[in-house]
Amino acid sequence: MKSDSMKEGLARAPHRSLLKSIGYTDEEIGRPIIGIVNSANEIVPGHADLNKIARAVKDGVYMAGGTPVEFSTIGVCDGIAMNHIGMKYSLGSRELIADSVEIMATAHAFDALVMIPNCDKIVPGMLMAAARLNLPTIFISGGPMLAGRYPGKPEKKVDLITVFEAVGAVKSGRMAPEELAIIEDAACPTCGSCSGMFTANSMNCLTEAIGMGLPGNGTVPAVMSERVRMAKQAGMRILDLLKNGVTPDKIMTAKAFRNALAVDMALGCSTNTVLHLPAIAHEAGVSISLDLINEISGIAPHLCSLSPAGPNHIEDLNMAGGIQAVLKELARKSGLIDPDCLTVTGRTVGENIASARDADGQVIRTLETPHHAQGGLAVLFGNLAPDGCVVKQSAVVDKMLVHEGPARVFDSEEDATTAIMDGRIKKGDVLVIRYEGPKGGPGMREMLTPTSALAGMGLDSTVALITDGRFSGGSRGAAIGHVSPEAMEGGPIAVVKEGDTITIDIPKKKIGLKLDAGEIQNRLSGWNRPAPKITRGYMARYADQVSSANTGAIFKK
């Protein structure tokens, strides 16, 4: 066992003495040492109840003959960090989480790991660490929040995005402040990751699809006892993975990532998956290009219309059979799902889905009756984004799939939000929010406040928003992010001027600035890089090390 290097033999008497000071017995020290990576805290709704999950995991580890040793990681709530300086720190926390798990697991010679994440950057950060460390690892997430119900109208579901969009509705006079207060109180009724197909749930579902979580990991609600039982099963299962030498490199293969991308497209997941899956794959020695994402989107249909794109929530997907049912439906089409990929169950994808439910035709549509023939995400290229940009095409109204309009240019999210709230944005406009990329932000903030304000004001069907920042999984409309190269790196987005004509053609995967190449080059030759917005601390170091969004915003070294 790896832990023998820190606990066995004469020279390790001091180490054993330290373990005994905590209360571990010789019997416990002699067992496999299983690191329990618990990201619980009291500020993130999806992490507020993770101590209960950790206790269940430890029970499972003990039942299977291991010794669980718990340690913590940080975790940021993107919703609470939204639209202020805090959002600059969210994406950067992904790398910090991966590094901290690597440090703890290596320094203490753990034999295997059980990861307990739930929300946006914690899930990919832990997956990156799992791939890097390549110790036997299993994931058990905290589970999704239940959707809220509008008081007096139990058939009307509400969620966090309902609140964000209601702010814009109040500002435009379309909703009374009293109704906003009612929605605010009703939208988030339980702990858990926010209830739609937003970033956290996207990543939890893809963790299951790629094989690193047990069936149900992505969809069983946080408040259900099934989640606790699953945690115990994960604790027991990790000892089997250790015994059989099943490490992440045997699960997170190139074929498994293709499976995850197919599920991504079927679910209509967050655009943030285009950052996270390549970053995780990079740690696993697998390459995921933007062209591959378009390739799979072209053949994997959009089967589930989940909030913010549709009326259903993760609890509905769970009741319809969850990720295993989605995998089973996709597997009916040759080339979409590789059934031979290994999972943490010890069985293959094909063996797991053999007992899964069939698509119900409503929450999970069949291949013959998809919401859209293509997948939920699309990557666009053109002279405005030579290295690509990303849109959740499943959340764009039909008439905005092709659009041309004048650029309304802003150098920060705050300036753009003020313009929207002040009524200065008109139908047909194309908002350009720049210097919000990985380096320029720094940290590539999510533009959920401006997209929600547009939706709340009824402008999401007539106004596009383009940014080198990114979007929450809760954003909808023609919200095009991850423009690469970013403005801070001298990308063409840096020299867009107020009133320039921008063309968008999502079906053709094109985005352009109606200027000839010579004019764009002339403007770029006169461009000067602005001073960094943060000059000390972690995010200053992050801005120096981070790469472009088109490669997953990973560190260069």
From Swiss-Prot:
Binds 1 [2Fe-2S] cluster per subunit. This cluster acts as a Lewis acid cofactor. One of its GO terms (biological process) is L-valine biosynthetic process. InterPro entries: Dihydro-acid_dehy_C, DihydroxyA_deHydtase, DiOHA_6PGluconate_deHydtase_CS, ILV_EDD_C, ILV_EDD_N, IlvD/EDD_N. The active site is at S472 (proton acceptor). Pathway: Amino-acid biosynthesis; L-isoleucine biosynthesis; L-isoleucine from 2-oxobutanoate: step 3/4; Amino-acid biosynthesis; L-valine biosynthesis; L-valine from pyruvate: step 3/4. GO terms for molecular function: 2 iron, 2 sulfur cluster binding; dihydroxy-acid dehydratase activity; magnesium ion binding. It holds the Pfam family ILVD_EDD_N. Its EC number is 4.2.1.9. Mg(2+) binds at D78, D120, K121, E446. The keyword DNA-binding does not apply. It is an enzyme of class 4 (lyase). HAMAP family: IlvD (MF_00012). PANTHER family: D-XYLONATE DEHYDRATASE, D-XYLONATE DEHYDRATASE YAGF-RELATED. Homodimer. This is Dihydroxy-acid dehydratase. It comes from Desulfosudis oleivorans (strain DSM 6200 / JCM 39069 / Hxd3). The gene is ilvD.
